[in-house]
Amino acid sequence: MYSPIFLRTENQLNKLLKSQRKSRKDWGILFVSLWDDASKTLVETINSKLSTDEEKSKPLYIVDSFKMPHAFVIFKTTKIPHLIQFKRGGLESEDYLSKVYEELGL
């Protein structure tokens, strides 16, 4: 289960990525565009269904294309919504909407 956290600056994302190299923790990044209806619906669903209080939940950092357009280049994101999951074994990338919902447990 994930707990949503909205990122506001690219500097925040860069710090998270840098710390990930050392810590190897499980967490995710969701790239969205709030101009897109599918992304809007997904973010509303995340806000209503995913909890922010659970201690065992993994952080899900949500990145908006309007606020951080250059962040999309890092993972070669061309479709939105795009879910990147950092797991101990590596990195998983998913950009099919139904699979994004499935991976998030929605």
Locations of the language-model features?
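A short glycine-leucine-enriched loop at secondary-structure breakpoints
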Residues: 73-78
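Residues at alpha-helix caps and immediate loop-helix transition turns in enzyme cores, especially N-
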Residues: 41-42, 96
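Short acidic-hydrophobic, aromatic-tinged amphipathic segments that line or gate anion-handling sites
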Residues: 2-17, 95-96
